[in-house]
């Protein structure tokens, strides 16, 4: 029985930490992006945006759960002492791919800006793409913030994420 309060404290300690808050934001903003796109008609390069959003949403969810449960030692090759470096690489790659999704979403938003008029009566994806652009920008910013934080911890010689 004495281990349960420590586990709860560990959960709360992680959830209240900078990394815990950032991971929750990454999960929520990433979900907002792919739900916004998936709930509407999409074509062409938007498939790549959806792929990046869903891929990193799933990876971030897995990293969040493993870190929350303190089970990163069970992950072969990238776990244990390499967990901080693995998180750093994940965040940097996510930031870079999200930057490309921002470009795609801004291009699509500008391409559909003609239908933002009151007299235009057909289905318009301008507001959907604009919302997705905002989600992509916010998500990239949060991944960048997390990457900077992990790199600072790595440079100081620390080996844990929290």
UniProtKB/Swiss-Prot annotation:
> How does this protein lie in the membrane?
Multi-pass membrane protein
* Source taxon at top rank: Eukaryota
Q: Which residue windows are transmembrane per the record?
A: 18-38, 48-68, 87-107, 128-148
Q: Where in the cell is it found?
A: Membrane; Nucleus
Which stretches of this protein does UniProt put in the Cytoplasmic compartment?
1-17, 69-86, 149-162
What are the MARVEL domain coordinates in residue numbering?
14-155
| Residues on Extracellular side | 39-47, 108-127
The principal localisation class reads membrane
UniProtKB keywords: Membrane, Nucleus, Transmembrane, Transmembrane helix
User: Looking at the keywords, is Transmembrane present?
Assistant: yes
InterPro entries, alphabetized = MAL, Marvel, MARVEL-CKLF_proteins
Check the record and name the PROSITE patterns matching this protein: MARVEL
Its BP terms in the Gene Ontology are: myelination
One cellular component GO annotation, for this chain's record? membrane
Query: Does the entry feature the keyword Cell inner membrane, yes or no?
Result: no
Single GO molecular-function term? Answer: structural constituent of myelin sheath
Q: What is this protein called?
A: MARVEL domain-containing protein 1
Q: Which organism is it from?
A: Danio rerio (Zebrafish)
Identify the coding gene.
marveld1
């Amino acid at each position: 029985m004495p281990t349960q309060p420590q586990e709860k404290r560990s959960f709360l300690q992680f959830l209240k930490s900078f990394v815990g808050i950032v991971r929750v934001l990454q999960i929520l903003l990433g979900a907002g992006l792919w739900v916004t796109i998936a709930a509407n008609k999409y074509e062409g390069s938007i498939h790549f945006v959806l792929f990046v959003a869903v891929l990193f949403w799933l990876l971030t969810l897995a990293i969040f759960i493993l870190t929350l449960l303190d089970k990163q030692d069970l992950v072969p090759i990238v776990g244990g002492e390499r967990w901080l470096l693995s998180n750093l690489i994940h965040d940097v790659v996510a930031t870079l791919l999200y930057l490309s999704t921002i470009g795609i979403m801004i291009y699509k938003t500008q391409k559909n800006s003609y239908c933002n008029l009151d007299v235009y009566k057909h289905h318009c994806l301008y507001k959907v793409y604009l919302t997705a652009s905002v989600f992509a920008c916010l998500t990239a910013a949060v991944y960048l913030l997390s990457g900077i934080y992990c790199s600072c911890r790595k440079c100081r010689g620390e080996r844990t994420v929290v």
